[in-house]
């Protein structure tokens, strides 16, 4: 409706002289391209060229949809993949039966040195246990002697002394250590590479 009205107005305003009208029309189209009288000429110039439509084969489209549906059904039927616990997985290199450490042949001097060292260590531990037994025996004898003296002095205190103490258990003790601790020892902070694998748990909604 608007285009027809503008076209009629343009024809009414166009002069009778053909040459003059053509010159004025060219002048108007050149310098007043955005005027209302040339509005219908701007619409085709602002539009985009038509794109060529792709021919879609309905058979191929249907096959692609069917493949996608089959893939979705397969994923839904599959059991949920659990995150593996690497601590319970034995590496294959440790399952090889032929993997054995070569036997080291010791010299006669090294064998004698180790045997003598083992004898000295056994003698040291034997003396240590003998000293511990003697110490415990002396403590028990002193305790029994003190209880007998306490019973003669006060039977009531003796009954309280031999009563079981519920706070003694559970008993916790650290040691004994085979090597003495190093005073003011600061353990070194070593460098390490974190090679822990990160797994993403995928859950399917059924």
Curated annotation (Swiss-Prot):
Compartments, record wording: Mitochondrion
Molecular function, one GO term: RNA binding
GO cellular component: mitochondrial inner membrane; mitochondrial large ribosomal subunit; mitochondrial ribosome; mitochondrion; nucleolus; nucleus
GO biological process: anatomical structure morphogenesis; mitochondrial translation
Organism of origin: Homo sapiens (Human)
Main location: mitochondrion
Entry-linked Gene3D superfamilies: 6.10.250.3440
Disordered: annotated segments: 168-192
Family membership noted in the UniProt record: Belongs to the mitochondrion-specific ribosomal protein mL40 family.
Signal sequence bounds: none
Record: transit peptide: 1-46
Tissue: Ubiquitous.
Keywords of this entry: Mitochondrion, Ribonucleoprotein, Ribosomal protein, Transit peptide
Name of the gene this protein is made from: MRPL40
Pfam families: MRP-L28
Protein name: Large ribosomal subunit protein mL40
Subunit structure: Component of the mitochondrial large ribosomal subunit (mt-LSU). Mature mammalian 55S mitochondrial ribosomes consist of a small (28S) and a large (39S) subunit. The 28S small subunit contains a 12S ribosomal RNA (12S mt-rRNA) and 30 different proteins. The 39S large subunit contains a 16S rRNA (16S mt-rRNA), a copy of mitochondrial valine transfer RNA (mt-tRNA(Val)), which plays an integral structural role, and 52 different proteins. mL40 binds to the major groove of the anticodon stem of mt-tRNA(Val) in the central protuberance.
Superkingdom of origin: Eukaryota
